Amino acid sequence: MDLLPFLLDANLSATNPPAIPHWWKRQPLIPNLLSQELKNYLKLNVKEKNIQIADQVIIDETAGEVVIGANTRICHGAVIQGPVVIGANCLIGNYAFIRPGTIISNGVKIGFATEIKNAVIEAEATIGPQCFIADSVVANQAYLGAQVRTSNHRLDEQPVSVRTPEGIIATGCDKLGCYIGQRSRLGVQVIILPGRIISPNTQLGPRVIVERNLPTGTYSLRQELIRTGD
């Protein structure tokens, strides 16, 4: 089950939904107002949750509730600032920083010291260590290697626009990340510029900079090694 259609308050029976969901239009996250269907799917209300929370984990509910699904493990040193929802059977790695507005689906793995802010992470996605994922969507079964970065702010301080099959959309958002399609695989230190879309089943080699929307395919940098000193 995809979380994003519920968060957009979209008509799930619509016959002509946009090719790419307008992920920037989702409503502010209020955990106790999620639909019962979502709560059941994320196993937020089961009687025996068996959640494992290690020592020195900080759960800060000053700005909103933090709700965690069954059989999820939160490792040593992680910081979670509500409002946040984490589904069932997830692993939140050591010193991960989960910031407000984030909702994480079932079976997600978050690596060491990764920071996630105001993002939707769909089911069975894997996000490696030391990544920064902000104002973005990571679709189901996507894999992000270490130190992947989603840029969410233009240096000229202009609102972020998104190029879609329907045309260029002025989102009005000062901060907006990207949409990473399902089953995409991103190598170490990939950087995605604001408002970009990576199509499903796309593979990006290490250190690729995503400057434009990418259709499904395999992409890599061409490297030239020059030996000197002989």
Curated annotation (Swiss-Prot):
Any one GO molecular-function label of the UniProt entry: acyltransferase activity
- Stated EC number for the protein is 2.3.1.-
Which top-level enzyme class is recorded in the Swiss-Prot or TrEMBL entry?
A: transferase
Q: Which domain of life is it from?
A: Bacteria
Among InterPro entries, the record links this protein to: GlmU-like, Hexapep, Trimer_LpxA-like_sf
Q: Which UniProt keywords apply?
A: Acyltransferase, Repeat, Transferase
Family stated for the protein in its record: Belongs to the transferase hexapeptide repeat family.
Q: What is this protein called?
A: Putative uncharacterized acetyltransferase YaiX
Give me the gene this protein comes from.
Answer: yaiX
